[in-house]
Each structure stands twice: as structure tokens, then as C-alpha cells.
Amino acid sequence: GEVTRAGLAPGTSLTLLAIAVDDAGRYGKVMRYSCSTSVPSFNEDISIALSVTYDEKTANVKVSSNGAEIVRYYYFTGEVSSSSWTRVLGGTRESAEEYMAVNSDNYLISNTDEKPLTDGCIVMDDVMMNEEHVAVVMAEDVNGRLSRAHMLKFVPELDLGDFVYRGKTKWLSTRPTVTFLSCEEEGDFYIINWKVTPAAGTTAYTICTHPNAMEGCQTPEELAVRIYNTGVEVVPGKIESTQYGDKANLVYVTWKDASGNFYEPVSFAVQ
């Protein structure tokens, strides 16, 4: 038989005790075997530099290195609050380095053979704006030795422009129209269909969700960012739909004008 212990840290010592039992129920001698997991040999000469720029809902993490010929990079990206970062990779540079060094084939860890850099960058799509993110990168040289991990934490900020508040003339003149099309019971949920018609020259974002999902938004600006992050950009004429709705849900809408100024959101009770 074979005994496997996965997810162990480098340099972990283990002792295996085993005993055999025959058909008559008689025990044999206790067998003892000690072993330890290997400790990676790092190339301390490799240095990595990371920097980040942002597009709309996209973060581009620029990767560069020197000190050795590099054949590939291994990297992890995600939100600092995610369980992948806090629980699996341990939430620190040191713990992430330890994990990545022995689990480079884990689905959480990407490499540039499978996901090449784009113009020298790791491209993070659909990032949550105004939330802290982390990128951890390790390089592998031609001899198969890894560099030390380099970590970059960053918060991609959504530019709200000159925020326009409820009741202002510009707010009133650009407020989108929301039309409820149906609310059909489906088991324990409701299928809710609605349509948003933005004013000319504006782009709207919408979501249908329970008010509890918006708890923690203390200001109109925070609510606008939450809708932008978790909702969808409105395509004029398209019917929006949620499959697991509740009659207590609200439809939230925020919008921005051609100058990039966001507007205080509105909400509508499901009809």
C-alpha cells in the first residue's frame, strides 16, 4: 500500500508507524520510518520588480527581473480578502513563497508557459475596484531553481470624476428609466426581468439584489462602486435578468456621463 500526505511545508519531518495483522488477528512488529520534505534551493541572485497600471476593470502587473536567465514565471493574483490568499497561501509573502515552491502545479498558481505575459504584464481582468489585491511572482532559471517570491499589494481605484448627487439638475436630466417586464415564481426563487434605458450620452450599470448585499456602503459613492463592481454594464435595449431573485430585491442603477462623472445611484422595488 501507499500512504500520501499532501500540502506539507518544506522541511517538515514525519514519522510513519505501521503494523501488519495476519488472518488470525496476530500483530507483527511495529515498523518505523522517518522522512522529511525537501527544502527548495533558491537562486538568491534573481531579483524581481513589479509595478501596476489600470484600465477599466483591468489591472496590468508589469513583471521584470535580472540576475539570471529566466525560463518562466509562476504567479498568484487575487483579492487580499479571498480565502485563496488568506487560508491557502497563508496571507504573507513568506507563506506564499513556501506554498508556491512546492505547489506550482496547483490550479491557484499560474505560469507563463500556460498563461504568457501580455506586453510583459500579468493581466487581471474583472478586478474589484477599490478593493485591495495582491500579486506574488516567482521566477525559474534555466537550471530549474526558483527565485524568492516578490509581492505587490495594490488598490485599483475607480475614478468617479465629479460625483453628481441626487436632486441636482444634471442628475435629474440624465436619470435612466427602469422598466420591469416580469417577476415569475420559480420554486423558492423569482425570475426577475427588467430593462434600463440610459439617457443619451450616458453609460449605466445595474444589478438586481437584496438590500442586504449593499450593507456596508456608507455613502452614495461607495454604493456606486459596489454596483459597478457587482452589476453589469447596460446594453441599450437588452433585457436584464436574475434567475435567483427575491421579491424583496431592489434594482439598483448608477450611471456616468461622457466626461466620466458618476451619478448617485437610484433603486427600484421589484414590481
Residue ranges and their predicted role:
Residues D23-F42, V142-V164, S259-Q271:
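Extracellular fibronectin type III
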Residues F42-L50, G161-R166, W171-T179:
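Proline-enriched interdomain boundary motifs that mark the N-terminal boundary
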Residues K57-V61, Y190-W194:
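Structural beta-strand segments of beta-rich domains
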Residues R87-K115, C217-E233:
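Solvent-exposed serine/threonine-rich low-complexity stretches and specific carbohydrate-binding patches
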Residues S64-E98, V196-P220:
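Solvent-exposed loop/turn segments flanking beta-strands in beta-repeat/beta-sandwich domains
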Residues T15-V21, V134-E140, L250-K256:
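Extracellular recognition modules
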Residues T4-S13, S110-L117, V123-E132, G231-A248:
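Surface-exposed, short loops/turns at beta-strand junctions within beta-sandwich domains
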Residues V52-K57, S182-D188:
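Short, solvent-exposed loop/linker segments at the N-terminal edge
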